[in-house]
UniProtKB/Swiss-Prot annotation:
Role summary: Plays a critical role in the incorporation of lipoproteins in the outer membrane after they are released by the LolA protein.
Gene name in the database record: lolB
Phylogenetic lineage: Bacteria, Pseudomonadati, Pseudomonadota, Gammaproteobacteria, Enterobacterales
Chain residues carrying a lipid of type S-diacylglycerol cysteine: 22
Pfam families: LolB
Subcellular location: Cell outer membrane
Cited InterPro entries: LolA/LolB/LppX (IPR029046), OM_lipoprot_LolB (IPR004565)
Keyword terms: Cell outer membrane, Chaperone, Lipoprotein, Membrane, Palmitate, Protein transport, Signal, Transport
Organism: Yersinia pestis
Subunit composition and interactions: Monomer.
Protein name per Swiss-Prot or TrEMBL: Outer-membrane lipoprotein LolB
Amino acid sequence: MPMRKRHFYRLLPLASLLLAACTIPVSKGPATSPTSPQWRQHEQQLQQLGQFETRGAFAYLSDKQKVYARFFWQQTSPERYRLLLTNPLGSTELELVVQPGVTQLTDNQGKRYVSDDPQEMIQKLTGMSIPLESLRQWILGLPGDTSDFTLDDKYRLKKLTYQQNGVTWVVDYQEYNTQVTPSLPSRLELNQDGQRIKLKMDSWTIK
């Protein structure tokens, strides 16, 4: 019995140390606030990207239709860009060319349409609701006209919520390409009332 008691008392200090170790607070790391200098620096680098190209996979999913395509996005200035959607065989399904004050859309039959509102035109002709004006910035990892967003531990966009005219879009940034500087999104998903748009960027070219 005495032997057992001594053994028991010897274990007490060790048990106390283990309990104390379990209560030591763990550092949560640096705050990733939208006002942090690291985010401001990253944001400024993205805003300076006036010309770029990216290509990859596009998916539009809703109760009414499902569209899968390859896409090519070419931006030559903040107000000039081209969006090309092609099918698995490489044939053009849709080409959108946007310039200040005028937008031209060419469908898979070669018919051309002109408008001053690219988002409205693409919705009327294809049935797809794509927030093009905002997507121009979201695709780069910029929040655009919303201040409702969170950052990941690398001070990049993680999630944003954008509301306009009673419509709410939620954008989730799922992966980034760190082979380019600054790092740019490689996978993101847009959600709006049962509609989903998935983009997977296979490559980026910064000019």
